UniProtKB/Swiss-Prot annotation:
Belongs to the universal ribosomal protein uS19 family. Pfam families: Ribosomal_S19 (PF00203). This is Small ribosomal subunit protein uS19. NCBIfam families: rpsS_bact.
Amino acid sequence: MGRSLKKGPYVDPKLLKKIRELNEKGEKRIIKTWSRRSVIVPEMVGHTIAVYNGRKHIPVYITENMIGHRLGEFAPTRTFTGHRIPTARITAIK
């Protein structure tokens, strides 16, 4: 079940405070965050936010198309290396 509409989107208060400070100053710099659950709001557009994926911070440039999604959606936690390629020996056995 999703979040109630009357509550509004969740944004980490510390992250929102940093975004608002940068907007007031007119600065653009990378903001590190561990809050993958925060929803992207229009105030964040144009900023680069480094989202932690469990190992390192992945820089994510926020665009208008991302509004309403969560930060964690753009920093994958698992790396898919691909399936095993069948070798000649395995195909000969079949």
